[in-house]
Each structure stands twice: as structure tokens, then as C-alpha cells.
Design a protein with these regions (language model features):
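Short beta-strand segments at enzyme active-site cores
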Residues: 35, 103-106, 214
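Short, small-residue-enriched loops and turns at beta-alpha junctions
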Residues: 14, 41-44, 79-83, 110-112, ...
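Glycine-rich anion-binding loops and their surrounding alpha/beta cores
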Residues: 9, 56-62, 85, 100, ...
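Short amphipathic alpha-helical face segments that pack within enzyme cores
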Residues: 35, 91-95, 290-293
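N-terminal glycine-rich anion-binding loops that anchor highly charged ligand groups
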Residues: 1-3, 10-51, 58-67, 286-287
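Active-site cofactor/substrate anionic-group-binding motifs, chiefly glycine-
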Residues: 44-111
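Active-site-proximal loop->helix
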Residues: 109-126
């Protein structure tokens, strides 16, 4: 099928099947980038399209070998949710790693927000431009590695200028969390809407993910929220399951969204360090909620409250701060 025909099909509101979606993205990655992203945005992406596109992205990615003898998790959101919070999932990654889960965090620089995960990690002293072999050493030796998307998805260089020019969320925002180059079998993914969360969960199920939670806060957060309810879609070998998470489920107090605001990378790095040094307050609580969910996903704990206890112990013992510092130091020796 010609690309013009695909565009016409999408603009008529007709969806692509899995095979057509995969073939389409393979052509995009080889250099054909018309207004496809805009057409998909206007129509609304389906789970089949997401799964097909993600399969093509995974096949084209540079692979990073993850340790086979331990659980490996990714904490990744679609980013740019417009809420202006600090880099929650990045801090969560250190807490979860300190609690015994190897974290292969897939991420990028900011495209529409003030600070992406790559930006805040650099502000915390990380080298992010590591080759795949160095990333593998970070996973094996430190239990944490940052998988810098541009280095591992080189074919996406053809769409990056389009994303920056459009300055709107497109299907590529949704695809990043679905295409972890280390093939992390456990995932905690943040979505930009409840509808997107449901579709991303369906796509993960098609792609054979072992276990994942795809979450969206009613306040707009692409994280587990502590301002109110969070819509959560669980993917497991038993299929898909929806549940609503609230701060009370974690044994935590609700906080206003304003208490979670961040800023540029340097400010967000300072917030991250204060949390890991044990400072109490809303930023710590939202990290505890997300870390607890991640620990449930990785099958380290059974309940959210048990997860909060494990996460709090990782912070209060100094293990999470040590995890961050050890991981950063290793990247500097390898870079």
C-alpha cells in the first residue's frame, strides 16, 4: 500500500491492523515521514496500531542485554503531561533499584516539558551517552542503567525533527514506553489519558509483556497520583484488569498537585536529592506510591502498603541515595 493511501485511510478514520501498522512504521524508520503522526493523532491510535508500531520499533532498536537471573523493570512515562511536576519516575527508579529490582530506565531529553529524564540525570552527575555495552555493565554491576532513546533507536532520528516542530503529543510519545531496548519484562508506565492507558495496556498484552501497570492520574499525571484517584490497567498472564488507586490504598495522605511542582533540570535534581536524603512531604509520598506500585509489578511484594514500607526503608536507610551515587559514578568511569 502506498503511503498516500495509508494517510487517506487514516484521515477517513479507518484504523490499521497490526501487520499494516508494523509495515508502516518500518517504512517511516527507513525515511518516509509524511503527516502520518498528525493523521493518527486526529483519528486516535488503536491498540493494534500501537502494538504493530512498537513491534517495528523493537525490531529496529539496538538491543541491550539485561541480566537473566533477576527481575528487570522499566519506570517510564510518556512525558510532557503539562502538570509541571518534578521527574517522579526517575527518582522512583533509584528507590526500586535499592529495594532489589534491576531497573532498565528508558528515556530521553525533554521534548515538550522543562526537564526530561536524561536532563535531570545529567544534573545528578550521570553520563547518559554510553554505548550499549556500558549500559549492560551498569545493569549488571549497579542494578540501574539509563537507556538513552536516541542512542538505541537510531532509526528514529528521521522523526525527531518532526516531533520537535509539531510540539504536540503524537503516537511516538506513546511508543517509547512500549519499546524498551532491554526487553524489560516488568513495567510501570505512565499514560497521558485514561483512554491511552487502556490502549497501551492492550498493546503490551499483545506484545507479550509479563507484567505491567499502565497508569493515569485523574489530575492529569502520567504517574500514580497522590492528589486523588489513579486509573490503573494491569497486564499479566491472566489478561487485563482495571482498578482505581487512591492515596488511602497506600496508607498515604492526599496532597495538592501544586506540592509536586518542579522546574528546570537543576531544580528537579535538587528535589530528587532531598527526597533520597529523607526529606518528608508530598514529593516523598508520590515517590513512595509509585515505587510501591513498581515493587508489586515486579512481584517483590504482594500489597501496595507493603511496597510503601519497602520503599520507605530503602530511602530511610540511605540505600536509595547510595544507589543513585553508585550508578552515577559508574557511568562516569565508563563514559
Amino acid at each position: 500500500m502506498q503511503m498516500e493511501q495509508i494517510l487517506e485511510q487514516l484521515l477517513r478514520g479507518e484504523s490499521l491492523e497490526f501487520g499494516s501498522a508494523r509495515a508502516t512504521l518500518e517504512r517511516i524508520l527507513s525515511g518516509e515521514v509524511p503527516a502520518l503522526a498528525v493523521a493518527l493523532r486526529a483519528k486516535g491510535e488503536t491498540a493494534d496500531e500501537l502494538a504493530g508500531f512498537a513491534a517495528a520499533m523493537r525490531a529496529a532498536a539496538v538491543r541491550v542485554a539485561a541480566p537473566a537471573d533477576r527481575p528487570v523493570l522499566d519506570t517510564c512515562g510518556t512525558g510532557g503531561d503539562g502538570t509541571g511536576t518534578f521527574n517522579i519516575s526517575t527518582v522512583v527508579a533509584f528507590v526500586v533499584a535499592a529495594a532489589g529490582v534491576t531497573v532498565a530506565k528508558h528515556g530521553n531529553r525533554s521534548i515538550s516539558s522543562r526537564s526530561g529524564s536524561a536532563d535531570v540525570l545529567e544534573a545528578l552527575g550521570f553520563r547518559i551517552d554510553l554505548p550499549p555495552a556500558a549500559m549492560e555493565r551498569c545493569l549488571a554491576e549497579a542494578g540501574f542503567a539509563f537507556l538513552f532513546a536516541p542512542a538505541l533507536h537510531p532509526a528514529l532520528k528521521v522523526v525527531q525533527p518532526v516531533r520537535r516542530e509539531l510540539k504536540i503529543r503524537t503516537i511516538f510519545n506513546l511508543l517509547g514506553p512500549l519499546a524498551n531496548p532491554a526487553g524489560a519484562p516488568y513495567q510501570l508506565i505512565g499514560a497521558p489519558s485514561r483512554e491511552a492507558a487502556a490502549k497501551m495496556a492492550q498493546a503490551l498484552a499483545q506484545l507479550g509483556t509479563r507484567r505491567a501497570y499502565v497508569v493515569h492520574g485523574e489530575d492529569g499525571l502520567d504517574e500514580v497520583s497522590i492528589t486523588g484517584a489513579t486509573h490503573a490497567y494491569e497486564v499479566s498472564e491472566d489478561g487485563l484488569r482495571y482498578e482505581k488507586l487512591t492515596p488511602e490504598r497506600f496508607g498515604l495522605t492526599a496532597h495538592p498537585l501544586e506540592a509536586l511542582r518542579g522546574g528546570e533540570a537543576a531544580e528537579n535534581a535538587a528535589i530528587a536529592r532531598r527526597i533520597l536524603e529523607g526529606e518528608a512531604g508530598a514529593p516523598r509520598d508520590v515517590v513512595l506510591a509509585n515505587a510501591a506500585t513498581a515493587l508489586v509489578v515486579a512481584e517483590v511484594v504482594r500489597t501496595l502498603r507493603e511496597g510503601v514500607e519497602r520503599a520507605a526503608q530503602a530511602i530511610d536507610s540511605g540505600a536509595a541515595l547510595a544507589q543513585m551515587e553508585k550508578s552515577a559514578a559508574l557511568t562516569r568511569t565508563l563514559g
